[in-house]
Regions:
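A conserved hydrophobic helix/loop-capping motif in glycosyltransferases and polysaccharide synthases
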Residues: 7-16
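Conserved catalytic core of nucleotide-sugar-dependent glycosyltransferases
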Residues: 76, 106-170
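Active-site acidic Asp-centered loop
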Residues: 99-100
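Catalytic phosphate/metal-binding cores of nucleic-acid and nucleotide-processing enzymes, i.e., regions
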Residues: 7, 38, 42, 77-85, ...
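Short loop->beta transition adjacent to catalytic acidic/histidine clusters or analogous donor-positioning motifs
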Residues: 5-7, 28-38, 52-53
Length: 170
């Protein structure tokens, strides 16, 4: 199984004073030798947080994805991309994980799955090794003008966490 000393964990996103300390503590508990990179926004209060490397990013803001007369819907995809990418630049370990700052580990069992089911076809390989995530699902969040005409986004990768070789996540 993969040793925690070979893992960089990029904790990305806004700091929640209640959940983020729990998130960091859970990483120390279940991945005790992992490198923790906290990647958040400039001007954020990061006092009393346990991390190894700090990355303070300029907040790119949200993206408007739908607008109706009574409601606007925004997406944080640019924030996730910036904070994850900048955190990965500081990662020094063979494996990397992108983790939202409000998630809490309850085990390290995800590591058991990284090298399971290694058979794969060569025609469709994008990465050196597979990337683990918690779920792939379908979203209906692309603006097309009318709510009834929303476009399906199949195989949308969850923003909760990703794990793989650092070179693949880069």
């Amino acid at each position: 199984m993969i040793d925690s000393k070979d893992i960089s964990v990029i904790v990305q996103g806004p700091i929640n004073k209640k959940e983020t300390p729990k998130c960091l503590k859970s990483i120390r508990k279940f991945l005790p030798e992992a490198e923790i990179i906290l990647s958040t926004w400039q001007g954020t209060d990061i006092s009393n947080l346990d991390y190894d490397i700090l990355v303070l990013c300029e907040d790119p803001g949200t993206t408007l994805i739908e607008e109706f007369t009574h409601k606007k819907t925004y997406n944080n995809m640019n924030r996730q991309l910036v904070s994850t990418k900048e955190g990965l630049k500081k990662a020094t370990r063979k494996y990397a994980m992108k983790l939202r700052s409000d998630l809490i580990f309850t085990s390290d069992r995800f590591l058991e799955y990284f090298n399971k089911f290694e058979a794969r076809g060569n025609n469709y390989n994008l990465f050196k090794h597979k990337i683990l995530t918690d779920v792939l699902f379908t979203r209906f969040n692309i603006k097309t003008g009318k709510f009834e005409n929303r476009v399906i986004i199949p195989f949308h990768v969850s923003d909760w966490w990703l794990f793989g070789l650092k070179e693949d996540l880069d």
